[in-house]
Design a protein with these regions (language model features):
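Terminal amphipathic alpha-helical/low-complexity segments used for targeting or macromolecular assembly
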Residues: 1-93, 222, 227-271
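Structural signal for interior beta-strand "rungs" in well-ordered beta-sheet cores
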Residues: 93-233, 246
């Protein structure tokens, strides 16, 4: 592993090494390991999530060493550098026609892919549903038993290297047409109602107490979140700016599905 990292780091500093077959082989091995789930762009530790920047470098370097190839699927034709993921049956993944995942994305057993898209470097945990027209961007990290509802957009990130990927932790529910980008971290068992938009600068305001509590870039565990707005002064007057409101907490329960249904009913959250 350390040798792979050294080769990638050297090629990052000196792009002429991309002509070297040993370098190309090392980069492709890193992408193959991402595809198998033996490497991850980001991973949880006892001290929080860490981002493996050298692996992101390998993904970026993978593009210039790949040649364009035509891919034919029945009457459809594609022309790209990155091969498609294969072997879904042996991996225990259900894939509905028109769903697409790129090689270099790890998809665990029990995942259901409706017509959707998962990009290179992404990680999707066991039992997760990727619903119709949902997209999982490059290097995004999706936990176990997550529900990405129809039209959800999970942002990807390759560059800048220091930028963190979007992280959606285990048992979270992301409602229809939600957008989560710019390295936002949604902690375990959170519920985002339909149309919530979260960027790195979006104010996430907990309104459940006597005084509002503001977060940015992070949704605390088990939070129930809906779209909101707040007044902001501009030269032309006062206007409402979008934000996200934490309106309650999903109750802890060993039965996560029951807990989710209760939260949706209790807070009248559109999904």
């Amino acid at each position: 592993m350390n040798q792979l990292r050294i080769v990638v780091e050297n090629a990052w500093e000196d792009r002429s090494q991309l002509e070297n077959r040993v370098t190309q082989s090392a980069i492709r091995e890193v992408v193959d390991m991402l595809d198998r789930g033996t490497l991850r762009v980001a991973e949880p530790t006892e001290n929080g999530w860490i981002v493996n920047q050298w692996i992101k470098k390998a993904v970026v370097l993978y593009f210039p060493i790949q040649k364009m190839e035509t891919i034919e699927c029945g009457p459809f034709e594609y022309h790209d550098k990155i091969p498609l993921k294969t072997g879904y049956k042996s991996k225990g993944i259900r894939v509905v026609p028109n769903a697409v995942a790129r090689h270099g994305a790890y998809i665990s057993k029990g995942v259901i892919m409706m017509p959707s898209y998962i990009n290179i470097g992404a990680y999707v945990g066991e039992g997760t549903m990727v619903d119709t027209w949902a997209t999982v961007g490059s290097c995004a990290q999706i936990g176990k038993n997550v529900h990405l509802s129809g039209g959800v957009g999970i942002g990807g990130v390759l560059e800048p290297l220091q930028a963190a990927p979007v992280i959606i932790e285990d048992n979270s529910f992301i409602g229809s047409r939600c957008i989560v980008v710019e390295g936002v971290h949604v902690e375990s068992e959170a519920v985002l109602g339909a149309n919530v938009v979260l960027t790195a600068s979006t104010k996430i305001i907990d309104v459940t107490g006597d005084q509002p509590v503001q977060y940015k870039g992070r949704v605390p565990a088990r939070s129930v979140v809906i779209p909101g707005s707040y007044a902001k002064e501009f030269p032309a007057g006062t206007f409402n700016v979008p934000c996200a409101l934490i309106i309650g907490q999903r109750k802890e329960s060993t039965n996560k599905k029951t807990s989710l249904n209760d939260a949706l009913r209790e807070y009248n959250v559109a999904v």
